[in-house]
Amino acid sequence: MNLKEHIRVIENFPKEGISFKDVTTILQDGKVLNYTVDKLAENLKDKKIDKIVGPEARGFLFGTPLAYKLGVGFVPVRKKGKLPYETISCKYDLEYGQDELQIHKDSIKKGDKVAIVDDLLATGGTIASVVKLVEELGGEVVNVSFVIELTDLKGKDKLEGYDINSLVQYNI
């Protein structure tokens, strides 16, 4: 299956000059969703994963079914103030300002082998923050996987030294 054929591209969204890669078309088709989750799982088959971690919001959409398929837990990483229990935080830079991500303190145990999953790798700032949170809790990041990678934005540079997979690549 050519997954790229199932990703809707919307020009000038959310603003002029942006070419938005819409994964809702993957989610709407059961066969395509199954294929996507199976391909993500294939990249992890030889790793002994304890947890899948996914950032808000689209990391939840692929991370949860992947965790189910692998028989492991799923850990959400959310924006500040959205998780109900004790958290740790990591700030990261945006184009104009900063944002903050949080994870529950008890979600990752020391030595847990963790795979991080998200829909898209662009500049790498969000995922680099997720890596920091997992490692601060004592987890070992054994893989970082994406459905889509925007290669021209060089997000992999912020993840140097980690095993990284993406199913579809776009040059923007």
From Swiss-Prot:
Record-listed E.C. numbers: 2.4.2.7
One of the GO biological process terms: adenine salvage
PANTHER family: ADENINE PHOSPHORIBOSYLTRANSFERASE
Cystine crosslinks: none
One cellular component (GO) term of this entry: cytoplasm
Keyword tags: Cytoplasm, Glycosyltransferase, Purine salvage, Transferase
Role summary: Catalyzes a salvage reaction resulting in the formation of AMP, that is energically less costly than de novo synthesis.
Domain of life: Bacteria
Species of the source: Clostridium botulinum (strain Loch Maree / Type A3)
Molecular function GO labels: adenine binding; adenine phosphoribosyltransferase activity; AMP binding
The name this protein goes by in its record: Adenine phosphoribosyltransferase
InterPro entries: Ade_phspho_trans, PRibTrfase_dom, PRTase-like, UPRTase/APRTase
Subunit comment: Homodimer.
Subcellular location(s) of the protein: Cytoplasm
Protein family membership: Belongs to the purine/pyrimidine phosphoribosyltransferase family.
Recorded catalytic activity of this chain's protein: AMP + diphosphate = 5-phospho-alpha-D-ribose 1-diphosphate + adenine
Enzyme class: transferase
SUPFAM superfamilies in the cross-refs: PRTase-like (SSF53271)
Involved pathway(s): Purine metabolism; AMP biosynthesis via salvage pathway; AMP from adenine: step 1/1
